[in-house]
Regions:
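Aromatic, loop-rich ligand-recognition surfaces of beta-strand-rich domains
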Residues: 1-47, 79-123
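Extracellular carbohydrate recognition and processing domains
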Residues: 46-86
């Protein structure tokens, strides 16, 4: 997982990720995005247990699941631009849980990650 402190609460985000320029690297393919008001890894990992040897269940307590993104690009230096993601409530911390990588490895590599605060305008 990857945790980002935005420094202040935001109501909507979008992000841009760039894969590394190395062909053998494993990028994120499927991720769950969670948000929280505070950074508390002990709460996040509350209830960790081994299942089937290597698989780990994580409770994600204290966070709110916002979305699941699938089919992220797997090419060398390939760029992904997310849509605007409205958050369920203003939040300061983003938790990117990588559930699948492009090469099926238990680790991932990113070249760059940019996160943008967005404003939502409702037209009447």
């Amino acid at each position: 997982y990857l945790v980002v402190d935005l420094g202040e609460e935001v109501s909507a985000i979008k992000f841009r990720s760039t894969n590394t320029n190395r062909a053998n690297d494993s990028s994120w393919k499927t991720i769950n995005l969670y948000t929280s008001d505070s950074y508390n890894p002990a709460e996040w990992f509350d209830g960790v247990e081994k299942i089937d040897g290597n698989t780990v269940y994580i409770s994600q307590a204290g966070t709110q699941k916002e979305t699941t993104l699938t089919g992220l690009p797997n090419g060398v230096s390939e760029v992904y631009n997310s849509e605007i993601i409205p958050l369920s409530k203003p939040s300061r911390y983003l938790w990117f849980e990588v559930t699948e990588t492009t090469k099926g490895t238990p680790y991932f590599a990113l070249g760059e990650l940019e996160i943008y605060q967005c404003s939502m305008v409702v037209l009447e």
